[in-house]
């Protein structure tokens, strides 16, 4: 919620979640809709952060990337002009893709994991790249952030 007492409570809980991720040396995955900058300000001391389902501003996205953090774009990039602008501006080496299933479908109806290919194709077109290049780099990024061998 957006009222001050609720935001303060959310910040206190978020600090606890940050501490858990830090103590376990795990990436912190943040869904910070309408609070991207405050969330970023709270995690700048961390090494591994993913901004899940990012929908914030370009300056905050750039600041997150400059901190080495990942920006994850959901399949709504296929139908949202704002998300297409984000896709154009995110650096490929800081990009992750996701569906956020069953939500944010690229078309009418329930979303599903296979739809991530729609995002990859569109992001490739926006960036003037081949879909295979976007798929390969986002797979590499995913393995890197989650320490998958």
Language-model regions, residue ranges each:
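Divalent metal-binding pocket/active-site signature
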Residues: 1-67, 85, 106-114, 129, ...
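Active-site gating loops and adjacent loop-to-helix segments of metal-dependent hydrolytic enzymes
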Residues: 1-2, 99-102, 115-120
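Short acidic/histidine-rich active-site segments
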Residues: 93-112
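Short amphipathic alpha-helices and their capping/turn segments at secondary-structure boundaries
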Residues: 82-92
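Mid-to-C-terminal alpha-helical segments outside catalytic/metal-binding sites
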Residues: 19-20, 116-149
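Active-site glycine- and acidic-residue-rich loops that bind
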Residues: 70-83
